[in-house]
Amino acid sequence: MGFFSFIQEIAMDLGTANTIIISDDKIVVDEPSVVALDRRTDKMIAVGEKAKMMYEKTHDNIRTIRPLRDGVIADFTACEQMMRGLIKMVHTGSRLFSPSLRMVIGVPSGSTEVELRAVRDSAEHADGRDVYLIFEPMAAAIGIGIDVEAPEGNMIVDIGGGSTEIAVISLGGIVSNNSIRTAGDDLTAEIQEYMSRQHHVKVSERMAERIKIHVGSALTDLGEEAPEDFIVHGPNRITALPMEVPVCYQEIAHCLDKTVAKIENAVLSALENTPPELYADIVKNGIWLSGGGALLRGLDKRLTDKINIPFHIAEDPLHSVAKGAGIALKNVDRFSFLMR
């Protein structure tokens, strides 16, 4: 970028769990959506991974906040500070001025006008001059490599931290969609609750997240792909003495069953509302899974068996939305589905 380039273009997947920023076709920021603030002054102390390291470990003068809940902004001021801090990471090197930003930001397809306004306002307060919004399933489809402008139906199931976005896309628009606030965070909360109830061990959100990554599963029989048991360390919730509990994937699959069933039902509900011609395309093309939730072991197989339509996991599910927003950034004049 030259010295006289005053406009910087960035694409952002503003997620409940992680925020990803793309600039010049490269992922330049991939950080947890967490910010640490000084309680006395409300000044930002840390953002992203550094703030996450402080999460659940702070004293009275520091508060760590996850500004997004269920895919939407829950704390406007904290979100603005977090966006500003993460955008600063893109501007490496010394500069006499901050460039004005052209931004494309992914938002849940079930967002209300108020929620969309909150994202736009946060972006503008964080120096966004030209702000476009794109619905996350549309961005995910573009990121996966689907021709969203074709006269053909494609279904995307994007399972993030805070929401699951299901959309049927054709001719550059969303034909039918279903957005539910059941997603990765709910799986983590289920594990926390299960460990407390079943094993009497208190686990933090971060430990529950690690359990999900190591032994999380949507199926009780993974065959050859079964992971090894995971050892959980934590205090006994009754005696407060330290405990060591081995956890296997089968018990986590049982514990996550109800939450996964909610996602199944949401997909079925979206299919019910799909016009027959597009339904035929979806049966032929299969359904695409993106977002961190797509990485839950056995989820694609469970959904395929239940719904009788093949489910494919996107090549890079964690970054599909960000990559799609990055492509949209290069086509703001062409893509009529971008919201200004």
Where are these regions (language model features)?
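Nucleotide/phosphate-binding catalytic cleft detector across ATP-hydrolyzing
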Residues: 1-159, 167-287, 294-340
